Swiss-Prot record:
Subunit structure: F-type ATPases have 2 components, F(1) - the catalytic core - and F(0) - the membrane proton channel. F(1) has five subunits: alpha(3), beta(3), gamma(1), delta(1), epsilon(1). F(0) has three main subunits: a(1), b(2) and c(10-14). The alpha and beta chains form an alternating ring which encloses part of the gamma chain. F(1) is attached to F(0) by a central stalk formed by the gamma and epsilon chains, while a peripheral stalk is formed by the delta and b chains.
The family this protein is said to belong to: Belongs to the ATPase B chain family.
The organism's place on the tree of life at top rank: Bacteria
Lineage: Bacteria, Pseudomonadati, Pseudomonadota, Alphaproteobacteria, Hyphomicrobiales
Organism whose genome encodes this protein: Bartonella quintana (strain Toulouse)
Stated name of the protein: ATP synthase subunit b 2
Gene name tied to this protein: atpF2
GO CC entries: plasma membrane; proton-transporting ATP synthase complex
Amino acid sequence: MTDTFWAFVGLVLFLALLAYFKVPEMIVHRLDARAKRIKDELDEALRLREEAQEVLAEYQRKHAEAEKDAQEIIAAAKREVEAVVSEARTKAEEYVKNRNKLAEQKIAQAEADAIRVVSSSAVDLAVSAARVLIEQELDSNKANELIKESLFEESLTKMKAYLN
């Protein structure tokens, strides 16, 4: 019996002792438990990855919606600004038009007043000239008589009113 034989016997006894205490089953059990734990962690990681992808997709969808809403709001604001500017321009043009019309009316009124004043002055001048000529042409008795009867004054007043 050599040393190798005794080493072999020792090895067989050691392996038998390990089998008796169920060490290989414990090792297999621990390895299975560890493999299960690793598999569970991988499954959890996959689930978290899928969840993260869903969250990312949801975020991207919401971001796209927000971008679209922002573009719609900007477009609506631009349309509203254009409408306000157009309305302001229309009101300004209308205001200028009304002011021009009012100025033209004032000018026409001033022209009419000037014509009336000139016409009235011309009538007064004509009446005065007529009075002077009539007084010069008539003798003083007849002139006094006409003035006393007020026919002359009344006819001059009527003529003045008619010419004005």
